[in-house]
């Protein structure tokens, strides 16, 4: 799984919207789309202890990304179903497309760990994984071993990559970008929040996901390599050892699910990403007429009711 990368993705998607969608796609929808997969599945992955008993998934990796399990929450199919629900409910293209882009970013990023995601569900329940780093969520290790493994492997580089992408598009974090591109795409939500927050507060809220990601990355990396004193193979270490080799780190048990050959995963993920943007770009104009008709129909019903 990825950690701070999912926070940075939100701004990367916002900064690289198709030209016709700039200033018209909801930032909140991108955020909720990227947030949804782990919101639905991750709590039971780590579970919790109560009166000395652990409650959670017996096979966290199976529950999180597999089938049967909540692996469906990390499929493009599920994201599309959510988008259809949003469209049927509100006929709001800013939210429908924003959710689709955020959700897709999460699902496609998660092909990197040794479990991956079921990209072709429901046509196939095989996982698609690049095995870039080891998936490390376990019943005994919990989130601490998971974090230590991630921030000692190429997972750290994944977070760093997305951080660089956002910093390379630094204008997405500026007040001017927020005023001219973010607020106009979702005026009602920002206006509603403005009842309690002034402009500085609203801007801080917009930037908060990015700064949370930065703090999360720094804090967990510091804990894993400065604070922690793990016992590995009977040897006490001052911090978890770094291992930036493929499929690392070496000191974590490498788990996987039935999967396709890793050689086709990256090309397939890039093709699917291209398809998502192509479809979003293609239906964008048509959705506008659908929104206008839906609003007109709601007004008619309201007036006649």
Indicate where each model-derived feature is located.
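N-terminal membrane-targeting hydrophobic helices
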Residues: 1-305
């Amino acid at each position: 799984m990825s950690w701070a990368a999912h926070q940075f993705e939100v701004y990367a998607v916002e900064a690289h919207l198709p030209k016709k969608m700039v200033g018209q796609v909801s930032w909140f929808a991108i955020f909720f789309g990227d947030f949804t997969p782990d919101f639905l599945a991750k709590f039971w992955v780590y579970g919790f202890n109560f009166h000395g008993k652990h409650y959670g998934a017996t096979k966290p990796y199976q529950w999180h990304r597999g089938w049967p399990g909540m692996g469906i929450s990390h499929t493009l199919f599920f994201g599309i179903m959510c988008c259809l629900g949003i469209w049927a409910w509100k006929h709001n293209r800013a939210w429908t497309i924003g959710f689709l882009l955020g959700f897709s970013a999460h699902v496609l990023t998660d092909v990197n760990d040794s479990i991956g995601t079921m990209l072709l569900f429901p046509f196939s329940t095989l996982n698609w994984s690049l095995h870039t780093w080891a998936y490390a969520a376990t019943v005994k290790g919990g989130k601490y071993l998971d974090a230590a493994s991630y921030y000692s492997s190429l997972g750290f580089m994944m977070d760093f990559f997305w951080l660089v992408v956002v910093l390379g598009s630094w204008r997405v974090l500026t007040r001017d970008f927020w005023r001219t591109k973010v607020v106009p795409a979702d005026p009602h939500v920002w206006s509603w929040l403005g009842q309690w927050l002034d402009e500085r507060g609203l801007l801080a809220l917009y930037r908060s996901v990015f700064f949370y990601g930065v703090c999360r990355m720094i804090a967990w990396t510091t804990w894993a390599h400065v604070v922690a004193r793990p016992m590995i193979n009977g040897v006490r270490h001052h911090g978890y050892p770094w291992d930036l080799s493929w499929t690392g780190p070496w000191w974590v048990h490498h788990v996987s699910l039935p999967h396709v050959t890793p050689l086709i995963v990256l090309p397939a993920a890039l093709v699917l990403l291209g398809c998502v943007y192509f479809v979003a770009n293609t239906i964008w104009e048509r959705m506008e007429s659908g929104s206008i008709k839906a609003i007109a129909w709601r007004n008619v019903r309201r007036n006649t009711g």
